[in-house]
Amino acid sequence: MNLENNMSKMTFCISTLNNNNYLQLAIKSVRENSHFKDAPFVIYAENCTDGTNEWLEENKDKYNLEVYIETDNNPKRGIGGGMNFCASKVKTEFINFLQADIYVAKDWDLELLKLHEKYVGKDRGIVFSQRVQPDIFNDSERAGTIFVPMEEFGEYYHNFDEKYFLEFCAEFRKLNKFTVRKGEGVSGLIRKEDWDYIGGNDDRFAPAYCEDMDLFIRMQNEGFKFMLTSESLIYHFASRASRFPDDDLTKRPQELSDVEQ
């Protein structure tokens, strides 16, 4: 297929709960740095109390967003259920899932399509972006994720250096040309048909956030192909996905109801 002219081949999808500042940065990066800048973009906001709903209503036309807001879910759908909700609204061939606390580099979406065409083709499969993440937990390096000092690009939305990160990504792509057979649960491109076939996330895990492990096991058992590429890069603010409230890395939520997506 002609990848260059298929802006409606995919739909970007984000499910969020109280990630307003990071969500704004994520949406901005998708619209500015994606190859398919005008592709459909579904946002699902659940039980948000931090101004997310108001910001989405005010900016949905500016960013051409398809916005869905639920304010009093009990029990909550959680991130897995939110992904399922977003997927149910997709009308394009591909779904491109993102978390709310990411920043995407140039042409990340086009490179995922290229990877899918090359390694998955007509089979069932899902492809992923190389992740760059601030080293909040003193993690060990692993395939698919580069841990950098927290001050390298910034660990928060308010001190993130967009220009420096994009320069790093351009240089990284020049020096690294690799694919890895694995999944990373941040940015995943999958055919809508394949998502429906596997049944999406299992709601028995809601509203917790371990559902991707179960999803990947089911995909593996069904013969799905997994592949990750160095050509598609994203920054993942682990401070939010790791459930640190209010950007304070010294605190953790005490109640299940405080868990944020």
Task: Describe the predicted segments one by one.
Residues 19-32:
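Short, well-formed alpha-helical segments that are part of the catalytic scaffolds
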Residues 45-54:
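A conserved acidic beta->alpha catalytic loop
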Residues 72-90:
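Glycine-rich, basic loop-to-helix element that forms the pyrophosphate-binding segment
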Residues 95:
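Short aromatic/hydrophobic "clamp" motif used to bind/position activated sugar donors
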Residues 109-125:
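Conserved donor-nucleotide/metal-binding helix-loop-beta segment in metal-dependent transferases, i.e.
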Residues 127-147:
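Short beta-strand-to-loop element that shapes/binds the nucleotide-sugar donor at the catalytic cleft/hinge
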Residues 155-159, 165-190:
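A recurrent flexible, glycine/aromatic-enriched loop bordering the glycosyltransferase active site
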